[in-house]
């Protein structure tokens, strides 16, 4: 297990020197954030970022994310240009020592929540997805903006994108994903870079847009499109676990035993009666997922990929990027570390 931590670059209130102080953190998960989606990342910019990360004694080997341009997801004639740029990004990142690239194939929006500052009983604030709030949301007119969303779109551009997706159902999106994978995975193989798709969050259609990386059946279908270890998963326990139809422990066991999980996002969620959910502390009793069992199957299957604590609450008066404060994610990192250390020692005692 290689424990890592997400960092949003120079503008992140969470500084590298703070992350360095979390015991057992080895790698930084980051990206180039000032280049428009679909354009090339220069080797100079990549090496500058690498040098900054490594100056704090941390590794630069996981990128999250290299975003996929909407023209690729839509299957437009212009997609080949953006796919060629994507290939070049894989090549340049490999030259800098990157081993895993996380990405997603969600139309227009990344992860979606209906509120980013829900106050919990203990006074902390968290991200929530309430279905009654979603009914009142209009992404074309509302003001909600989330860290995963591309904020560069104007309202007119968003409206135009929604119109283009009118003719894209799940099967069309599958076809466009297949086209993309068959282009980029051979490059990833040549460069020894493992591609790791992130599940859709939440794992069902939203705002009338199709979503396909959502459940075990669809993950099986995805992995068979290009049956290569370089075509793998970012397994996000919260993204898949926020839907009751997903057996997260079973799925982690299955895909880690196949060697197809390259990156784990570990967080907990509390499922509500109507299918809504709240993000919780990582500690298993705080939510609906059994983090200990998840870590046990990873350990059993000798998982040696990357793992990071995912979204955290805002605690101890911290403010900043929703879900990405320092304190609660640091607690999550140490919870994960403690479980893993215990499993390691028990395993050695049993031999």
Curated annotation (Swiss-Prot):
InterPro entries: Man_deHydtase (IPR004628), Xyl_isomerase-like_sf (IPR036237). It comes from the Bacteria. The gene is uxuA. GO terms for biological process: D-glucuronate catabolic process. This is Mannonate dehydratase. The keyword Manganese applies. Keywords: Iron, Lyase, Manganese. Belongs to the mannonate dehydratase family. Catalyzes the dehydration of D-mannonate. Pathway: Carbohydrate metabolism; pentose and glucuronate interconversion. NCBIfam families: PRK03906.1 (NF003027), uxuA (TIGR00695). Its cofactor is Fe(2+); Mn(2+). It catalyses: D-mannonate = 2-dehydro-3-deoxy-D-gluconate + H2O.
């Amino acid at each position: 297990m290689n424990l890592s931590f997400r960092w949003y670059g120079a503008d992140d209130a969470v500084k590298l020197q703070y992350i360095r102080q979390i015991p057992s953190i080895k790698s930084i998960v980051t990206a180039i954030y000032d280049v428009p989606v679909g354009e090339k990342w220069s080797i100079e910019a990549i090496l500058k970022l690498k040098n900054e990360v490594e100056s704090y004694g941390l590794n630069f080997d996981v990128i999250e994310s290299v975003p996929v341009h909407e023209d690729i997801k839509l299957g437009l004639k212009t997609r080949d240009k953006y796919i060629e740029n994507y290939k070049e990004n894989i090549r340049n990142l490999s030259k800098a020592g990157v081993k895993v690239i996380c990405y997603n194939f969600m139309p227009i929006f990344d992860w979606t929540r209906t509120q980013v500052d829900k106050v919990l009983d203990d006074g902390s604030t968290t991200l929530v997805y309430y279905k009654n709030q979603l009914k009142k949301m209009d992404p074309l007119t509302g003001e909600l903006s989330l860290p995963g969303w591309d904020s560069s779109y104007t309202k007119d551009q968003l409206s135009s994108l929604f119109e283009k997706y009118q003719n894209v159902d799940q099967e069309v999106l599958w076809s466009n994903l297949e086209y993309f994978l068959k282009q980029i995975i051979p490059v990833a193989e040549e460069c020894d870079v493992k591609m790791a798709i992130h599940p859709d969050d939440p794992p069902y259609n939203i705002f009338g847009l199709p979503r396909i990386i959502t459940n075990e059946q669809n993950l099986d279908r995805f992995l068979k499109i290009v049956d290569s270890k370089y075509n793998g998963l970012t397994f996000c326990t919260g993204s898949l676990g926020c839907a009751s139809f997903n057996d997260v422990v079973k799925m982690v066991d299955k895909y880690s035993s196949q060697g197809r999980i390259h990156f784990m996002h570990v967080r907990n969620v509390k499922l509500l009666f109507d299918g809504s959910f709240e993000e919780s502390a990582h500690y298993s009793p705080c939510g609906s997922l059994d983090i200990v069992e998840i870590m046990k199957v990873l350990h059993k299957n000798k998982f040696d990929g990357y793992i990071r604590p995912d979204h955290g609450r805002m605690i101890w008066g911290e403010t900043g990027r929703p879900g990405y404060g320092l304190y609660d994610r640091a607690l999550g990192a140490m919870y994960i570390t403690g479980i893993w250390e215990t499993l390691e020692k028990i395993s050695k005692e049993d031999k």
